[in-house]
Amino acid sequence: ATPSDIELALDFDCRVLKFFPAEAIGGLRYLENIAVPYRHLGVRYIPLGGVSPENLISYSSSPDVLAVGGSWLAPRVLVENGDWAAIEQLARQAVELVKGTTE
């Protein structure tokens, strides 16, 4: 999650990079600041770590973000209990939040 990390990834021709732990290292503001010099190369990011329903729209609205991930989509207790319907509902809610920003 540093410019040096991005440079190393580019050496390997990687253009999609994990941005972790997103919120702990400065969130979307930090991501957008480090992304600027690489935009012309088509580098995109997948923020993880601290992404939540409350900041999902901000992240997904950024042109630097390809996708997001978060443990809130499949909390451990729901996985352990096999509550796939609840996990599906959380995923559907996330999709609806994001769709609302693109329509």
Q: Model features per residue range: what roles?
A:
Residues A1, A22, I46-P53, S71-L73:
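Active-site beta-loop-alpha junctions enriched in small/polar residues
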Residues P3-F12, A35-V36, V51-L66:
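Catalytic cores of alpha/beta
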Residues I6, K18-G27, P63-A86:
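Glycine-rich phosphate-binding active-site loops on the catalytic face of alpha/beta enzymes
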Residues I6, L28-L31, L56, E88-V95:
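Generic structural signal for well-ordered alpha-helices
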Residues I25, E32-P37:
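A charged, well-structured terminal subsegment
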Residues Y38-P47:
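Short beta-strand/loop segments at the ligand-binding rim of alpha/beta enzyme cores
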Residues V77-E103:
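C-terminal helical cap(s) of enzyme catalytic domains, especially alpha/beta-barrels
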